[in-house]
Regions:
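N-terminal loops that bind phosphate or other acidic moieties
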Residues: 44
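Short, glycine- and small/hydrophobic-rich beta-strand elements in well-ordered beta-sheets
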Residues: 21-29
Length: 211
């Protein structure tokens, strides 16, 4: 598995060489940030520039193309002003799931109200429900389904925060705090087939919308 600390040190060096003094915030998301990474895990990097242009994006892409593990690098890139005007229901998960490396997202998180968290839960459940139905009927893609289970995990995180005021970042820890139904979403049974896994996700998302 990737030595993420060594990789980040190299990444930061290249970022400083290419964009000296231009990065407002740098962070890590996803399984590496949660300490739950596997060999197949992506490297989810968050880079917020003071100001972002298409020329900056071109230069950043060229920088990424010269990095090790290029095929695993993904993440979020934005200008600071654009992020400060983002839909606040999206900012809840974005801020809570990001491990800061340089800078702070406190200014961004302060924009997120209780109502925004409720919207995050509702819109997340709506998106999972619709995509689950579409995938079951048309695509029938196991990778899409796996991605929807990940999306559902974020909804469960947000709902748990909404109910308790506590944000539990590690999914393995959250699984011990929620209902059996939610636990089966956080830890889907690898022995189940596509249809049964789709059915469990469909039922969970439907209940989130109607209860």
């Amino acid at each position: 598995m990737i030595d993420i600390n060594a990789w980040l040190e190299f990444f930061c060096g290249r970022l400083d060489e290419n964009f000296p003094g231009l990065v407002w915030f740098l962070g890590l998301q996803g399984s590496y940030a949660r300490g739950e990474a596997k060999d197949s895990s992506d490297i989810d990097i968050v880079v917020i520039f003071d100001r972002l242009t298409m020329n900056d994006l071109q230069r950043y892409r060229e920088m990424l193309d010269g990095l090790p593990e290029r095929e695993k690098i993904c993440g979020f890139v934005s200008g600071r002003d654009e992020l400060m005007h983002w839909e606040t229901s999206d900012l809840f998960q974005f801020c809570r799931d990001t491990l800061p490396i340089r800078g702070s997202l406190a200014e961004v998180l302060a924009l997120v109200s209780d109502e925004a968290v409720k919207r995050a839960v509702l819109s997340g459940a709506c998106n999972v429900y619709h995509a689950c139905v579409h995938n079951f009927l048309h695509e029938r893609d196991a990778d899409i389904l796996a991605g929807l289970y990940k999306s559902a995990a974020f909804v469960i995180q947000a709902e748990y925060f909404m109910n308790t005021g506590q944000y539990v970042k590690r999914h393995c820890e959250l699984a011990g705090l929620v209902s059996q139904e939610e636990r089966e979403i956080l830890r889907p049974d690898s022995g189940l087939g596509f249809d049964e896994l789709s059915g469990k996700l469909f039922a969970w998302a439907g209940r989130r919308l109607t209860e």
